[in-house]
């Protein structure tokens, strides 16, 4: 079964605390790290942060064709997010993912257990609601559509961004990309998010969310 939006126990976080922590899950078959789309996004975001410090955490999971192992990514990402929220409460967290990694990040934001789905081992329930206060923005690139998920993993639940994250999520899909768009028919389009400016668009969206969050806290 594909990963579900449930979490394990938080792990320890290193000090000192950065201003911004990006937690990004790479796409299928990309080598460990954040992947090509992730790196383009991270670089574009860094250039928009001025003097703010930023750390990047590549989600640790197989990113293989076995979508059941995406659960490993949900567990790893949720552990990291909860750890940062607990030990670095002033750090603004940015979630992101490309392709299968966008599924991982999307499931992480879900409100509840999808009806009829069994939780994989190591997942205990949705992330605590107060964790969402520490997440400034979410950037999803080429998130698998429900139809695509059913084609490759028919036990996979649909990916629904939870209400606590919806207003701070940018979900980007190239219309020709068949992974995320039911009408898409050009498989090459799936790898064009950096080339067509969508990683820059997402970086600006996230930078604006980070700025507005900081301004709101300062005013408060």
What are these regions (language model features)?
Residues 43-47, 152-168, 172-174:
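Active-site-adjacent alpha-helix of alpha/beta-hydrolase-fold enzymes
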Residues 21, 136-139, 169-170:
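Structural motif
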Residues 1-14:
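Secretory targeting and sorting signals
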């Amino acid at each position: 079964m594909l990963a579900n939006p449930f979490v394990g126990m938080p792990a320890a976080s290193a000090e000192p605390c950065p201003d911004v922590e990006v937690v990004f899950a790479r796409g299928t078959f990309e080598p460990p790290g954040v992947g090509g789309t992730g790196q383009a996004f991270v670089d574009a975001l860094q250039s928009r942060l001025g003097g703010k410090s930023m750390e990047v955490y590549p989600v640790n999971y197989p990113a293989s064709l076995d979508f059941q192992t995406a659960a490993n990514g949900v567990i790893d990402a949720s552990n990291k997010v909860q750890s940062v929220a607990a030990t670095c409460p002033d750090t603004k967290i940015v979630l992101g993912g490309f392709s299968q990694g966008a599924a991982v990040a999307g499931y992480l934001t879900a409100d509840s257990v999808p009806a009829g789905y069994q939780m994989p081992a190591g997942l205990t329930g949705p992330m605590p609601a107060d964790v969402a206060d520490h997440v400034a923005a979410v950037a999803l690139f080429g998130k698998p559509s429900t139809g695509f998920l059913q084609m490759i993993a028919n036990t996979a639940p649909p990916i629904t961004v939870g209400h606590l994250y919806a207003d701070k999520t940018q979900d980007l899909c190239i219309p020709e990309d068949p992974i995320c768009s039911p009408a898409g028919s050009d498989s090459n389009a799936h790898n064009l998010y950096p080339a067509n400016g969508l990683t820059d668009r997402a970086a600006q969206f996230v930078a604006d969310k980070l700025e507005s969050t900081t301004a709101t806290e300062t005013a408060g």
